[in-house]
From Swiss-Prot:
Catalytic class of the enzyme: hydrolase
Localization of this protein: Secreted, Cell wall
Record-given protein name: Endochitinase 1
Segments traversing the membrane: none
GO cellular component, one term: extracellular region
Length: 15
């Protein structure tokens, strides 16, 4: 899951 700062999924928080 790709979550940019938790927007999609909170497992990867890419800031």
């Amino acid at each position: 899951s790709i979550g940019f700062d938790g927007l999609n999924d909170p497992d990867i928080v890419a800031r």
